Amino acid sequence: MSVIKMIDLDLAGKRVFIRADLNVPVKDGKVTSDARILASLPTIKHCLEAGAKVMVTSHLGRPTEGEYAEEFSLLPVVNYLNDALDCEVRLVKDYLDGVELNAGELVVLENVRFNKGEKKNEEALSKKYAALCDVFVMDAFGTAHRAQASTHGVGMFAPIACAGPLLADELEALGKAMDKPARPMVAIVGGSKVSTKLTVLESLSKIADQLVVGGGIANTFIAAAGHNVGKSLYEADLVETAKKLMEECAIPVATDVACAKAFDENAEAEIKHVSEVQDDDMIFDLGPNSTAELAEILKNAKTILWNGPVGVFEFKNFEAGTRGIAEAIAQSEGFSVAGGGDTLAAIDKFGIKADVSYISTGGGAFLEFVEGKKLPAVEMLEARAKA
């Protein structure tokens, strides 16, 4: 993937417009989770230290487009940056007709979704953003799958459009896992339904040497292998699709499972061979033998792509499968990439953050990349790099 990288540019004295992902949770005017801001700080600091005139913006929440609403203001982010950078950071509300700032100064441009035409990627708004800067930096991978004025349109008209460090790292890591993976390559896809991950499964079945399925998705494959899944969540209409995928790719099906009679946090886990599941059973996790078999596969993998837990890991009695998978990934010497909200929650719960090679910051964008779709913001950066 050929894009211009921000770190390769001379930014001294340049007006730099950074589209970051600062869409953080806010309560009572305070940022309650700063992970996304922390991820963006190195990009901002690099520009400031280079002597650039720095403008950073983002969306926050889902305001009615074109209307200001205080609850969706970036002011809490500005207050956070003031403390984190120990310098004065201004919030600029009206900026479409120009922004005055000095070299080495940082301003935050108010929520892009307050601007009419943002979501529809309107050309007039895109050109106004572009007129603010000498260099446009796209650094929000989480919104790279959306063609909007601040993620795509602005880059078409800015003098220079480049990838920020976060976006560049993300593309490099995902490219390493997907385009030319070291083998064997193992992909793990968990989640409740095959239907929501079908394109992901089809895409990965063509790349992976082994495709591990978990959660409700695994139940459909267990049914496809001819076993009873009782009252478990599964999709009968996709059993034939699962069979077809099993013919195309090595998909290990669980040999034992953890069941209960009801979806209850306190339900006791009953370990059963997959052939012994009763009509009133519900499968909530992999059994110990299946977990051990998959752990062995993962330990020998050279590339691992992980999206989704393999069981109801939020319940203590049904966390063992996901824990076993997480620990095997942590122990693997292969290159590992993980992404998706539930996956990140599992990584946090089992304390393996430092042992995963790369953790993706994008939910929808991560999935679309894995599906093999072109991300509009990335396509734009590639086109500008060629121009």
UniProtKB/Swiss-Prot annotation:
Residue numbers binding substrate: D21, L22, N23, R36, H59, L60, G61, R62, R113, R146
The EC number(s) this enzyme carries: 2.7.2.3
Superkingdom in the source lineage: Bacteria
Gene Ontology molecular-function annotations: ADP binding; ATP binding; phosphoglycerate kinase activity
Cellular compartments annotated: Cytoplasm
Chain coiled-coil ranges: none
Reactions catalysed, as given in the entry: (2R)-3-phosphoglycerate + ATP = (2R)-3-phospho-glyceroyl phosphate + ADP
Binding site residues for ATP: K197, E314, G340, G341, D342, T343
Keywords: ATP-binding, Cytoplasm, Glycolysis, Kinase, Nucleotide-binding, Transferase
Any one annotated GO CC term: cytosol
A GO BP entry: glycolytic process
Database matches in PANTHER family: PHOSPHOGLYCERATE KINASE, PHOSPHOGLYCERATE KINASE 1, CHLOROPLASTIC-RELATED
Entry similarity comment: Belongs to the phosphoglycerate kinase family.
Subunit structure: Monomer.
Annotated protein name in UniProt: Phosphoglycerate kinase
